[in-house]
Curated annotation (Swiss-Prot):
Name of encoding gene: recR
InterPro entries with a match to the protein in the record: DNA_Rcmb_RecR, Rcmb_RecR, Rcmb_RecR_Znf, TOPRIM_dom, TOPRIM_RecR
GO molecular function terms attached to this record: DNA binding; zinc ion binding
Chain intervals annotated as zinc finger (C4-type): 60-75
PANTHER family assigned: RECOMBINATION PROTEIN RECR
Name by which UniProt lists this protein: Recombination protein RecR
Purpose: May play a role in DNA repair. It seems to be involved in an RecBC-independent recombinational process of DNA repair. It may act with RecF and RecO.
Toprim domain segment(s): 83-178
Family assignment from sequence similarity: Belongs to the RecR family.
């Protein structure tokens, strides 16, 4: 039987770190040791930042983004085009689009995608709020920026059906050859999507 080599407080730190995505027990142990070694330079500021996050970070009541203000900085930015709402599954997708400067519109975070196998149904997502936003006269386009997975496509079709009565154009991200990609390395599904969505050159 293995014996604990650290005190209960350190074991608790390791246990909590191991709950983070991408950190298994071994990586969590290394991260904990690094934090302890850099106590003043890293652990104290990290603890302070986490406390601020607990106290100040909120979910935007309009789009579902997370921010220290509500509505969030994206929703209140006057330079954003209010006619376009980009629908994403989660906040990480919103941040990815923002890093790429891919959209000047506003966003709507669903919270997940429909997944019957995981027990995620329409009632678990913010689809009703999206439909309500789509009926705003200012809104003219809904961009479905969802993953090219079965769950993502199912969610896109479900939302499209619900938006039939709204006076908006529903578009989705193109799927196909990535920038810098070589055809020989792409899977059949990606190549088929690229051929279907080809554009004039």
């Amino acid at each position: 039987m293995a014996t604990a080599v650290a005190g209960p407080e350190i074991e608790r730190l390791i246990q909590l770190l191991s709950r983070l995505p991408g950190l298994g027990p071994r990586s969590a142990r290394r991260a904990a040791l690094h934090l302890i070694k850099k106590r003043e330079a890293l652990m104290a500021p990290l603890a302070s930042a986490l406390q601020v996050a607990i106290e100040r970070i909120q979910v935007c009541k309009t789009c579902g983004n997370i921010d220290t203000q509500n509505p969030c900085t994206v929703c209140t930015d006057p330079r954003r085009d209010p006619a376009i709402i980009v629908v994403v599954a989660d906040v990480a997708d919103l941040w990815a689009l923002e890093r790429a400067h891919a959209s000047n519109g506003r966003y709507h975070v669903l919270g997940a995608t429909l997944s019957p196998l995981d027990g995620v149904g329409p009632q678990d997502l913010t689809i009703d709020a999206l439909v309500a936003r789509a009926h705003d006269p200012q809104v003219s386009e809904i961009v479905l920026a969802l993953n090219a997975t079965v769950d993502g496509q199912t969610t896109a079709h479900y939302i499209t059906d619900l938006l039939m009565e709204a006076n908006v154009k529903v578009t989705r991200l193109a799927h196909g050859v990535p920038v810098g990609g070589e055809l020989d390395y792409l899977d059949e599904g990606t190549l088929s999507a690229a051929m279907r969505q080809r554009t004039l050159f």
